[in-house]
Amino acid sequence: MTDKLVKVMQKKKSAPQTWLDSYDKFLVRNAASIGSIESTLRTVSYVLPGRFNDVEIATETLYAVLNVLGLYHDTIIARAVAASPNAAAVYRPSPHNRYTDWFIKNRKGYKYASRAVTFVKFGELVAEMVAKKNGGEMARWKCIIGIEGIKAGLRIYMLGSTLYQPLCTTPYPDREVTGELLETICRDEGELDIEKGLMDPQWKMPRTGRTIPEIAPTNVEGYLLTKVLRSEDVDRPYNLLSRLDNWGVVAELLSILRPLIYACLLFRQHVNKTVPASTKSKFPFLNSPWAPWIIGLVIEALSRKMMGSWLLRQRQSGKTPTALDQMEVKGRTNLLGWWLFRGEFYQAYTRPLLYSIVARLEKIPGLGLFGALISDYLYLFDRYYFTASTL
């Protein structure tokens, strides 16, 4: 069982055991319960109210630490899967995981940049809260622009390290191996065969006497998919995302720089509130409170449109876009919905609508708790920029 896998992992480590090694062994032996423990702790950070000043920083710090811990758990689980001889028969990684895992293992620059941008993403809201509490609004906006500048620089470096392939929204492998699946992967081959025989009843053919596994009528398609290889399964990992052309690179740069441009426009708007009217921009539109929201949305929509045109040019040239290409473009398009929770649109339309829903929920017995939970998150959307950040 898992003890055998722990021994295999120990053989690969020549250094003396440390408390971290002991924790790794504990994690592998209790993989089934790790996910539930993480979920419970995250639920605590969700439920704790955000409207109390003494709690918001603590809860967001807890949430950030849990994300970092979860990322470390993913690394240990991936190492355990790689050390198991049964992994190939039970687990098939997704194209996203194959792609990101290859770059992390083969490109040190991508590895460190992806980790850095991930850690910055985990802690950005906490940093904004601390900056606002200690230095006021001006310090908060300087912190926001600094963080967005760091993330943009890291993503541009990652774009170059992939030789100008689209960046994955999540630059590291997702956790696809659950605790139960890890226990299955870690079992001996004999145990796996016995369990498979118990779970898959055999049907004996009357004429030849051969036996074949019975398949549930509703699961025929899923059964066949487990027996065949897709093109994504045999293609080289670094080819799972296509190379961008010149206009595709421009679209990717717009997507990377959009958060920084939007934050700078919001900062300029904040500064304009405290300066004389004579020093403001000569262009009336830039002085409008809607200017940052409109410009940011136009930049992001233009980037998505250009990425869609890149996929179309691939098809017209005879190249079939990969499944990961299409999934990434579709996922970015779905992120446009977050503009409902940003800037002047949120203040003018989304916020009043949500507060009216909260007021109605509080009048319905049994639903007041949900209204209070929504109100707690609206507190964060009202006061902090990174609450609605997606990159």
UniProtKB/Swiss-Prot annotation:
Pfam families linked: Pex16
The keyword Repeat belongs to this UniProt entry's keyword annotation: no
Alphabetically ordered keywords of this record: Membrane, Peroxisome
Any Gene Ontology CC annotation: peroxisomal membrane
Predominant location: membrane
Localization, UniProt: Peroxisome membrane
Membrane topology recorded in Swiss-Prot or TrEMBL: Peripheral membrane protein
GO biological process, one term: peroxisome organization
Keyword Zinc-finger listed: no
Family, per entry: Belongs to the peroxin-16 family.
Name recorded for this polypeptide: Peroxisomal membrane protein PEX16
Originating gene: PEX16
